[in-house]
Curated annotation (Swiss-Prot):
The protein's name: Zinc import ATP-binding protein ZnuC
Matching PROSITE patterns: ABC_TRANSPORTER_1, ABC_TRANSPORTER_2, ZNUC
Function: Part of the ABC transporter complex ZnuABC involved in zinc import. Responsible for energy coupling to the transport system.
Membrane topology per record: Peripheral membrane protein
PANTHER family assigned to the protein according to its UniProt record, in alphabetical order: METAL TRANSPORT SYSTEM ATP-BINDING PROTEIN TM_0124-RELATED (PTHR42734), ZINC IMPORT ATP-BINDING PROTEIN ZNUC (PTHR42734:SF9)
One Pfam family hit: ABC_tran
Region annotated Disordered, chain positions: 273-298
Keywords from the UniProt entry: ATP-binding, Cell inner membrane, Cell membrane, Ion transport, Membrane, Nucleotide-binding, Translocase, Transport, Zinc, Zinc transport
Substrates-to-products reaction catalysed: Zn(2+)(out) + ATP(in) + H2O(in) = Zn(2+)(in) + ADP(in) + phosphate(in) + H(+)(in)
Record organism: Brucella melitensis biotype 1 (strain ATCC 23456 / CCUG 17765 / NCTC 10094 / 16M)
Gene Ontology cellular component list: plasma membrane
Gene3D superfamilies: P-loop containing nucleotide triphosphate hydrolases
Amino acid sequence: MDKKSSHPAGAARDILIELRNAGVYRDGRWLVRNVDLSVERGEIVTLIGQNGAGKSTAAKMALHILKPDEGMVSHKPGLRIGYVPQKINIDRTLPLSVERLMTLTGPLPRKEIDAALEAVGIAHLAKAETAHLSGGEFQRALMARALARKPDIMVLDEPVQGVDFSGEAALYELIARLRDDTSCGVLLISHDLHLVMAATDRVICLNGHVCCSGTPRDVTSSPEYVRLFGSRAVGPLAVYEHHHDHTHLPDGRVLYADGTTADPIAGSTMGPRGHCHVEDGHHHDHEHHHHEGGQPRA
């Protein structure tokens, strides 16, 4: 089912986080103002904008790290948040294994650690030192750390920093898959205007305020977006909408809405024409991206 049509007409919206006319005022100026956004369960919402546009400030309001100087921010009662910050103060030269990283902010049952690492594709790196991880592997470890506490919503601030291009594609696909598997909401903050569009349901473009919002196609065709990022930003985006017409089965096969299947391992495609098939690049997971030694790195 397409996540963007997962709410039948008249059904109650399960809003996890909502900002209404929210703004932060510091040192005689508004860092960001008039921000309206909401994230529902099972939805990926992406904040995009250039450096200094107010993306991280808006995210901190959403997390209740910053109190708005105007407007309001509300959370669903009992909301559990998994947060992956833009920067994390860990000295990666010190001995620190991936499984130890998972418990830095509190103990976790072994089965929860194992399940989270498996979900992000790095179960084989549980005992690896974080200093030896690639950028993509380290980001996956941080996502696993957030995921292990079973959040209702994950807030990811620039999650592909320090990751190469193929690793970025794999991470965005992972984020979409985690949403599909757990039905959590996702608030994604990024200045990356390319691959992120393929993994999101709704885009909110910031430049000190909300310039435009809507589906990826709506936003990239809006005059406000073009004025902010320039006409060159429209063509290279290669925006496509990832319709969720399939389910990932426990044995690894992909089941499409019409009942046909595809086997990612064998590389065979048995789905109808027009689906996102396993060989067309839309289902590249962690183990499909390798460095020259054959080890998965992103």
